[in-house]
Amino acid sequence: MTAPILAAAVFCITVSVVQLTSVAIAVGRFRRSGPSGPPSKLPSAVGHFPSVSIVRPLCGIDNYAEETLSSTFDLDYPHYEILFCVASAKDPVVPFVKTLMADYASRSARLLIGDDRVSPNPKLNNVVKGWRAAHHDWIVIADSNVLMPPDYIERLFASWRDDTGLVASPPVGCRPDGVWAEVECAFLNTYQARWQYIVDTFGFGFAQGKTMLWRRGDLDAAGGIEALGKEIAEDAAATKVVRGAGLKVRLVNRPLAQPLGRRSAAEVWNRQLRWARLRRASFLLY
């Protein structure tokens, strides 16, 4: 066997072993997650069902917006408030949210409008007012296109430990409409999610901006919500803030759904390209 053939064989075997091992670890994580549904108690590091503030930054109306946003009101958790954040009063999502709030009038929900320029990141600028207005010490920042299951908050708390500074969840793409949405599902649900769970299993978890559970004091000790403006992406800054405090980012064992709907080739390509550039800018080795 010539040297090039031997090298190619070793490379193929190594890659196959790495791939199969990564799949086995990811599958093992999901199987350990247990049955769905609200637990009878939360980890000791959390306490007995503490009150939670959910901050949802909005911009425009996403695919499946009625379902994803209304899911915020249907959580099976005893004490939580909802803060919808919009940068402009002219955003078409404003009347949409007002209608939802009227339909769920028994829930504690507020719509906050305004643009606080604390960073070059428009999402973070939108979130700031929600963070400042939150009544509770446990705060979830969740993108508008996350579909929240009834046990959403319990699912986040279940991963919190004494050494945790943040719990996040990678998105699981679902309900694709068309070939390019299928491509994005394939990326989200295989390569991206799998490798995030690999590094998390070994204690090197990365924040994912789709959903982030914070304890207010941890972020305030690092300079407050404005500290997330130190990087181009708020989740990259979150990872560095948590690690800088000697704490860990952890992922939920059962990731959260993101309904995709229709996608064009350009949308998928541009999104993946933007994420790749953000990763390279914030974490050069990754």
Q: Language-model segments: what does each one mean?
A:
Residues 135-137, 207-222:
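Conserved nucleotide-sugar donor-binding
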Residues 160, 166-192, 217-220, 225-286:
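Catalytic donor/gating beta->alpha subdomain of glycosyltransferases that bind UDP-sugars
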Residues 50-53, 81, 237:
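Cell-envelope/extracellular polymer assembly enzymes that use nucleotide-activated donors
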Residues 127, 139:
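Short aromatic/hydrophobic "clamp" motif used to bind/position activated sugar donors
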Residues 143-147, 225:
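The conserved acidic donor/metal-binding loop of glycosyltransferases
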Residues 72, 99, 130, 149-160, ...:
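A short, amphipathic alpha-helix embedded in the catalytic core of nucleotide-handling enzymes
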Residues 69-118:
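Acidic donor-binding segment of Leloir-type glycosyltransferases
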Residues 1-45, 182-186, 194-198:
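N-terminal membrane-anchoring/stem segments of glycan-assembly enzymes
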